[in-house]
Swiss-Prot record:
Protein name: N-alpha-acetyltransferase MAK3
Enzyme Commission identifier(s): 2.3.1.256
Species: Arabidopsis thaliana (Mouse-ear cress)
Main enzyme class: transferase
Tissue specificity remark: Expressed in roots, leaves, flowers and siliques.
Example of a GO MF term: protein N-terminal-methionine acetyltransferase activity
UniProt family annotation: Belongs to the acetyltransferase family. MAK3 subfamily.
Length: 190
């Protein structure tokens, strides 16, 4: 427990600055964080695929100029659904447990909702208790277990967040209107 406290970086929440992906100068920062913290190796082409096609779904967190967290997402059609997907989420260890990951995910979800996504999915290692707890607090459910999903042989949970359907006012059909018209009592004309 003492070691954990020593490893924590001291800062006020207001010192963390969040920004959207703003160009090629952010790419090495994202790559460095993901490469050092996630189990899956990604090529430069994978990173570029996400940040060039969906820069509005990529966010970075900075503390005093140092990149301490990032989220990389995409969106597109999946079966009959327009779906958002969280591909990568990283917060470096000294900054974990302080709300940075929640803020990054919340910003990405908001951008996906505003773009018309109906749901968001992702995969997380079954052993990644921190990630599973984070996504659970944000309303994600475990939709499926994926056996031997990762290159390291670990299983994953597919997590899903469903957005509420927008309420559309019901407009009566022509048939209903005609039926109502025919059954509506009319005044008698003398």
């Amino acid at each position: 427990m003492e070691k954990e406290m020593e490893d924590k970086e001291e800062f006020d929440e207001g010192e963390i600055e969040y920004t959207s992906y703003a160009g090629e100068h952010h790419l090495p920062l994202i790559m460095s964080l993901v490469d050092q913290e996630l189990s899956e190796p990604y090529s430069i082409f994978t990173y570029r695929y996400f940040v060039y096609l969906w820069p509005q779904l990529c966010f970075l967190a900075f503390h005093k100029g140092k990149c301490v967290g990032t989220i990389v997402c995409k969106m597109g059609d999946h079966r009959q659904t327009f779906r958002g997907y969280i591909a990568m989420l990283v917060v470096i260890k000294p900054y974990r447990g302080r709300g940075i990951a929640s803020e990054l995910v919340t910003r990405a979800i908001k951008a996906m909702m505003e773009s018309g996504c109906e749901e968001v999915t992702l995969e997380a290692e079954v052993s990644n208790k921190g990630a599973l707890a984070l996504y659970g607090r944000l309303g994600f459910i475990r939709a499926k277990r994926l056996y031997h999903y990762y290159l390291n042989g670990m299983d994953a949970f597919r997590l899903k967040l469903l957005f509420p359907k927008p309420r559309v006012p019901q407009i009566p059909s022509q048939v209903q209107t005609q039926q109502e018209y025919e059954t509506f009592p009319r005044p008698r004309v003398p």
